[in-house]
Curated annotation (Swiss-Prot):
InterPro entries named in the record: Tryp_inh
A Pfam family of this chain: Tryp_inh
Domain notes: The presence of a 'disulfide through disulfide knot' structurally defines this protein as a knottin.
Organism: Beta vulgaris subsp. vulgaris
Cysteines joined through disulfide linkages: C1-C17, C8-C21, C16-C32
UniProt-recorded Gene Ontology molecular function terms: serine-type endopeptidase inhibitor activity
Protein name from the UniProt record: Trypsin inhibitor 1
Length: 33
């Protein structure tokens, strides 16, 4: 799975180890929670 802090797709949160893909604090990307 994708570790925390790695870029991810909000449409596919299951790719993250945490099952959560969240907006980055200041960059316009999503990262695993």
């Amino acid at each position: 799975c994708t570790p925390s802090g790695t870029i991810c797709s909000p449409e596919a949160p299951e790719q993250c180890c945490s099952n959560s893909c969240v907006p980055h604090q200041w960059l316009r990307i999503f990262v695993c929670a």
